[in-house]
Each structure stands twice: as C-alpha cells, then as structure tokens.
C-alpha cells in the first residue's frame, strides 16, 4: 500500500501544481472546454497515463466541464501517486 503524505508535504506538493486545489483528502481540478466533444476528448487523453501509472482518477463530466479528483482510496488519503498523476494530467491539453 502507498504511504500517506503528511500535511507539510501535501501543502508543498500542492503549491507546485497550477490549477489544482486540495479538497480534504483529495486533489481536484476542473477544466472547461468549448463543448461536450472537446470535454470527452480530454477525458480520453487521461486513459493512457492513468493506466500506465496504475492510478485512476475519479472523473465527472458536465457538458463542457470535466472535474478530475485524485486520492489513494486504499491508503485513505493523498500519496505521491496522486501528485505524480496530477502533474501528468496538468500537461494534457
């Protein structure tokens, strides 16, 4: 099981991620697109990096908005995997 990060490390890691917020024991970002088709195209781009990392975000789609939430469920909070996947997602347009 992945090691939970302490509060200081979580704050430090989160400060390096533009567009992400801490929501309790979760890391979230919301992206807005021109339309539903672009939103779904973005979601499809998340598949390969999530599979490669073996760490899958929770994804909510609302027409042209996509909310991506990361947490390590089996660890009960945030781990390095969450921040690594968030950094990868941040690079996806």
Swiss-Prot record:
Name used for this protein in its record: Putative pterin-4-alpha-carbinolamine dehydratase
Residues that span the membrane, as ranges: none
Swiss-Prot/TrEMBL catalytic activity: (4aS,6R)-4a-hydroxy-L-erythro-5,6,7,8-tetrahydrobiopterin = (6R)-L-erythro-6,7-dihydrobiopterin + H2O
UniProt cross-references to InterPro entries, sorted A to Z: PCD_sf (IPR036428), Pterin_deHydtase (IPR001533)
Single GO term (MF): 4-alpha-hydroxytetrahydrobiopterin dehydratase activity
Entry EC number(s): 4.2.1.96
Family: Belongs to the pterin-4-alpha-carbinolamine dehydratase family.
Keyword Lyase: yes
Gene Ontology annotations of biological process type: tetrahydrobiopterin biosynthetic process
Organism: Trichormus variabilis (strain ATCC 29413 / PCC 7937)
Pfam family, one: Pterin_4a
Keyword vocabulary terms for this entry: Lyase
Keyword Glycoprotein set for record: no
Source species, domain of life: Bacteria
């Amino acid at each position: 099981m992945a090691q939970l990060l302490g509060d200081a490390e979580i704050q430090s890691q989160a400060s390096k991620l533009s567009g992400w917020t801490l929501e309790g024991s979760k890391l979230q970002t919301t992206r807005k697109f021109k339309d539903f088709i672009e939103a779904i195209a973005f979601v499809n781009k998340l598949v390969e990096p999530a599979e490669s990392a073996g760490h899958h975000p929770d994804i909510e789609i609302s027409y042209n908005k996509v909310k991506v939430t990361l947490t390590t469920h089996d660890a009960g909070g945030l781990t390095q995997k969450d921040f690594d996947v968030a950094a990868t997602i941040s690079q996806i347009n």
